[in-house]
Amino acid sequence: MPDGVNGDRTRTYSWDDPLELLSRTAGMSGIEALRLIAAGELPPPPIGMTLGFGPIEVEEGWATFTVEPAEFHYNPIGVVHGGLALALLDSAMGCAVHSTLAAGVAYTTLEVKANFVRPLTSSTGPIRCTRTVVHGGRTVATAEGRVVDADGKLYAHGTSTVLIFGD
């Protein structure tokens, strides 16, 4: 992939081994693991490091993630790519469900839908995504989320359906 026409912008980041994180959280409930990640006592998953987001608050059935939109999130039309808000929604909604799961139980996204209300830019400032479990079944759960700025202005909202599996 080309470095760009001018090559005057760079971004370097690192991440921890995701299998090590999985090993360290084995035997923990979802909420225990998520609270340790939110507190900085466990490293965030690589997707959080790549996009620059992570959990800041977690309670049973809901989670709040934050990210500050930056130039490296931009698409070719000069705004933040919708994939950032979608990834934020997917992660937050999934973690809201994860916060309700016992040790040894996992989930995977079956479907995620997002509605983008207005564009994000690097001048938007930090955004938050707050998600809540709507239905927590034995094998399927649903959640909803909202992406807002510091003033509560809505940028995107969505829903997610996840498959629950494991012990």
PLM features per residue range, with description:
Residues M1-D167:
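Terminal targeting signals and extreme-terminal segments of soluble enzymes
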